[in-house]
Amino acid sequence: FVGFKAGVKEYKLTYYTPDYETKDTDILAAFRVTPQPGVPPEEAGAAVAAESSTGTWTAVWTDGLTSLDRYKGRCYHIEPVAGEENQYICYVAYPLDLFEEGSVTNMFTSIVGNVFGFKALRALRLEDLRIPPAYSKTFQGPPHGIQVERDKLNKYGRPLLGCTIKPKLGLSAKNYGRACYECLRGGLDFTKDDENVNSQPFMRWRDRFLFCAEAIYKAQAETGEIKGHYLNATAGTCEEMMKRAVFARELGVPIVMHDYLTGGFTANTSLAHYCRDNGLLLHIHRAMHAVIDRQKNHGMHFRVLAKALRLSGGDHIHAGTVVGKLEGERDITLGFVDLLRDDFIEKDRSRGIYFTQDWVSLPGVIPVASGGIHVWHMPALTEIFGDDSVLQFGGGTLGHPWGNAPGAVANRVALEACVQARNEGRDLAREGNEIIREASKWSPELAAACEVWKEIKFEFEAMDTL
């Protein structure tokens, strides 16, 4: 075999191609690379491209049997990270043919697989991915999307309200159902299974599904509004998960739930297909995300996990609350919130968006703000997230001194007051506390909630309107 030369050669000779013009069909990745001391950035970037595509550590005879130029990943641009020593953003282009159609699992196995244990790198983080329409079109995506969900629920022009039922573990099915009923009757749109409520000895899944369905129908009959409870179908096997989803459909409930990272993308995509085929909405919880996305220099940013979920399928996903966080973090959160909801998102490095993303007609996902929020946060949340969001108050509903239903009333009154104020042209950023105070004058439930959680010392600037 002519021209085969055994031995180890530098990656950059093959995989670093600064002159490469990216194709519209390429999947593009932005990696934050921290090379080991003495490893030049070109070699590190090329190593990432090689190890996440066609390369291996030594030249192999079988390379001659295929066209490497057609299939290899290419590191096409490298830039140093401002303010960091020896850290670079390396841009890698992958040819479309490297990935199985409609499989987030396969995409991640390549792009964030073995390469993350690579010795020449001290650390590696995937910051963003550009998914080309040629690839995204091979996915079903979210079962229904934002507009279809609004039509199913007949709720328009405001964020939706939810509540995670607490204590998350230990209630019997009957008491759990009662807690759901109280919240829904009080004015919430949804109640939620906690992510770790699956099927434990104190409450088996089937009993919970039954009592929660009863709660939904009773609350619907009393309020004249459509209600839902996120029934967590997450299970130890895919078969068991599907069995739970089927039972939910038989009960006629509107929505089920899945923990997509612990459950896995393969299970999630199967469930999303079932949900579209059977008219179920799908709520997604991101338990385990911080294991992957919390380190600044290693792992994968949540915006990548969010894009992956939009491909795999989900109608709601937890996306942080922004409230009380730093300004920069707000921009970055809103960056991936837009990636979840919008059709077309421009590249904007100040919001952490490394690539222009065109989803074409893939349905959007509703971001869910949940965790440590209460009535005083309502103006900020309405302003930051806008109408296409779900605001979830667990303790902020169930912690009300008069009980669950009054807690739900307080949240609904606060929300309606904020939406009305916004529609009248008032500035929620500056008048938020005032709006809540006014509303509490004619709602004793809200007044009691305001008293418990007192005004929070939280001044937030109006967002830059572009």
Swiss-Prot record:
It catalyses: 2 (2R)-3-phosphoglycerate + 2 H(+) = D-ribulose 1,5-bisphosphate + CO2 + H2O; D-ribulose 1,5-bisphosphate + O2 = 2-phosphoglycolate + (2R)-3-phosphoglycerate + 2 H(+). Mg(2+) binds at K192, D194, E195. The disulfide bond which can form in the large chain dimeric partners within the hexadecamer appears to be associated with oxidative stress and protein turnover. InterPro entries: RuBisCO (IPR033966), RuBisCo_large_chain_AS (IPR020878), RuBisCO_lsu_C (IPR000685), RuBisCO_lsu_C_sf (IPR036376), RuBisCO_lsu_fd_N (IPR017443), RuBisCO_lsu_N_sf (IPR036422), RuBisCO_lsuI (IPR020888). Its main location: plastid. One of its GO terms (biological process) is photorespiration. CDD domains: RuBisCO_large_I. The active site is at K166, H285. Its EC number is 4.1.1.39. GO terms for molecular function: magnesium ion binding; monooxygenase activity; ribulose-bisphosphate carboxylase activity. Keywords: Calvin cycle, Carbon dioxide fixation, Chloroplast, Disulfide bond, Lyase, Magnesium, Metal-binding, Methylation, Monooxygenase, Oxidoreductase, Photorespiration, Photosynthesis, Plastid. It is an enzyme of class 4 (lyase). Heterohexadecamer of 8 large chains and 8 small chains; disulfide-linked. The disulfide link is formed within the large subunit homodimers. This is Ribulose bisphosphate carboxylase large chain.
